[in-house]
């Protein structure tokens, strides 16, 4: 299931690094004084600039500025507000405290969302350029068409086993059993092999069932609490796979692009390409290695950190996907 992360915010650090990297005059500004000594902005900057968090903060600031300049007109305020409202709805009354605990204001979080959406736009556009007939055919081989299913979700394995026995009994009314026992209100789902509306274990097991087939108990993990969750699935609608991949061309394209979005190497390459176009240069030796992963991914031959794009995209903006930090929301996009 797709997620938006309220990343462990580097907003305060971003402000600090920006403040500390100002002109020499400002660097001499006093932060604190004491008998016989002072602490200046420059003192503070020199103290914090070598930390991993500071490097991530500078990297995030670079990503935000570069992508805003190159793709700023591609993401509307309406899109950002929609994603923000979905996150707020997910968290409910605890949303403000979730933001505050990570050093965010509401506007900070909207900026995070915007930066991530700018990156997503760029990655999608680059991914579309690379799609060939060979790409479609490869995706088609693994593709399983959409099915419709009745789904029972339970928190207890013992309860799941008991419900399964009832569901597999002769003449059982699976729809009623699902309605009476499932956690939550929804019992009917439609999905294919590229869907994210159910855990991957459930999708895999369900898509291998025949029409009217009932699964065994499928164990998965709750994406927010990480506690075990148990599923029972019955397929109510299933069609044979068309022999012509072109029948699924639109859906295959969506799946290919989605896979690229989740490919950290591809994302790094797109970010690296944007940095190159912007002629980004690092002037402070303390931050000399922060672009290495993007240079390597974009084919410049540089070697460097294998840190995922979370530092750049999610910390600047998710992690989501997902990612991930302790605070997440299933704000679907």
From Swiss-Prot:
Residue ranges annotated for the PpiC domain, each copy included: 144-237
InterPro entries with a match to the protein in the record: Foldase_PrsA, PPIase_PpiC, PrsA_foldase, Trigger_fact/SurA_dom_sf
A cellular component term, taken from the record's GO annotations: plasma membrane
Catalytic activity: [protein]-peptidylproline (omega=180) = [protein]-peptidylproline (omega=0)
Major location (coarse): membrane
Chain spans, region Disordered: 296-333
Lipidation (S-diacylglycerol cysteine): 22
Molecular function per GO: peptidyl-prolyl cis-trans isomerase activity
Keywords on record: Cell membrane, Isomerase, Lipoprotein, Membrane, Palmitate, Rotamase, Signal
EC class name: isomerase
GO process terms (BP): protein folding
The protein, known as: Foldase protein PrsA
Species in which this protein is naturally found: Streptococcus mutans serotype c (strain ATCC 700610 / UA159)
The gene coding this protein: prsA
């Amino acid at each position: 299931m797709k997620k938006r992360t309220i990343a462990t915010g580097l907003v305060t650090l971003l402000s600090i690094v920006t403040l500390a990297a100002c002109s020499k005059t400002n660097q001499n500004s006093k932060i604190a004084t004491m008998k016989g000594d002072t602490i200046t902005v420059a003192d503070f900057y020199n103290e914090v600039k070598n930390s991993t968090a500071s490097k991530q903060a500078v990297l995030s600031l670079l990503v935000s500025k570069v992508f805003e300049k190159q793709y700023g007109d591609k993401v509307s305020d309406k899109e950002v507000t929609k994603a923000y409202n979905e996150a707020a709805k997910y968290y409910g009354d605890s949303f403000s405290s979730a933001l505050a605990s990570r050093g965010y204001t509401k506007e900070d979080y909207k900026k995070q969302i915007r930066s991530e959406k700018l990156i997503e736009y760029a990655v999608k556009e680059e991914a579309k350029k690379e799609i060939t007939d060979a790409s479609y055919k490869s995706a088609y081989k693994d593709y399983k068409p959409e099915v419709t299913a009745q789904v029972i979700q339970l928190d207890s394995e013992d309860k799941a086993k008991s419900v399964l026995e009832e569901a597999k009994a002769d003449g059982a009314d699976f729809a009623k059993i699902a309605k009476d026992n499932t956690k939550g209100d929804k019992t009917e789902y439609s999905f294919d092999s590229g869907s994210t509306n159910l855990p991957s274990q459930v999708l895999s097991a369900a898509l291998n069932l025949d029409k009217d087939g009932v699964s065994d108990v499928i164990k998965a993990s709750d994406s927010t609490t990480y506690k075990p969750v148990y599923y029972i699935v019955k397929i109510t609608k299933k069609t044979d796979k068309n022999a012509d991949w072109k029948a699924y061309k639109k859906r295959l394209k969506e799946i290919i692009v989605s896979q690229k979005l989740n490919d950290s190497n591809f994302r790094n390459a797109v970010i690296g390409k944007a940095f190159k176009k912007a002629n980004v240069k690092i002037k402070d030796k303390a931050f000399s290695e922060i672009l290495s992963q993007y240079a390597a991914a974009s084919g410049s031959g540089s070697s460097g950190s294998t840190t995922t794009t979370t530092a750049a995209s999610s910390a600047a903006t998710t992690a989501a996907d997902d990612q991930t930090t302790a605070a997440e929301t299933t704000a679907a996009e």
